[in-house]
């Protein structure tokens, strides 16, 4: 059985979020939370929140044991891009892309043995 949590349209660039999500993929939940707490990246608290949501979903919806949970899937997809303009010299303007992310974490109970 798998439990899933998704954070959609989070205001962080997918490239930056993937750096953090790669650290926790395949880890046990307790170890993953410890890694996220000690990772000095802006994506860390956001991903930790999604992970806690996935754990809560597993516990509440599927009656899974929290101590046996493992992150089976963790990925970041690109969300809609917010397009902004920055004024430049001589009346010009240049485009600024504010990228967003869809963060997905799937947890399941690890097999015995």
Curated annotation (Swiss-Prot):
SUPFAM superfamilies, per database record: Ribosomal protein L22
GO cellular component annotations of the record = cytosolic large ribosomal subunit
Annotated disulfide bonds: none
Q: A Gene Ontology MF term for this entry?
A: structural constituent of ribosome
Keywords from UniProt, A to Z, are: Ribonucleoprotein, Ribosomal protein, RNA-binding, rRNA-binding
Keyword check for rRNA-binding: yes
Against InterPro entries, the record matches this protein to: Ribosomal_uL22 (IPR001063), Ribosomal_uL22_bac/chlpt-type (IPR005727), Ribosomal_uL22_bac/org-type (IPR047867), Ribosomal_uL22_CS (IPR018260), Ribosomal_uL22_sf (IPR036394)
Task: State any GO BP term from the record.
Answer: translation
Q: Which domain of life is it from?
A: Bacteria
Q: Which PANTHER family match?
A: CHLOROPLAST 50S RIBOSOMAL PROTEIN L22-RELATED, LARGE RIBOSOMAL SUBUNIT PROTEIN UL22M
* HAMAP family assigned to the protein according to its UniProt record, in alphabetical order: Ribosomal_uL22_B (MF_01331_B)
NCBIfam families in UniProt: rplV_bact (TIGR01044)
Q: Give a short account of what the protein does.
A: This protein binds specifically to 23S rRNA; its binding is stimulated by other ribosomal proteins, e.g. L4, L17, and L20. It is important during the early stages of 50S assembly. It makes multiple contacts with different domains of the 23S rRNA in the assembled 50S subunit and ribosome.
Q: Which family does it belong to?
A: Belongs to the universal ribosomal protein uL22 family.
The UniProt subunit note reads as follows:
Part of the 50S ribosomal subunit.
For this entry, the protein name equals: Large ribosomal subunit protein uL22
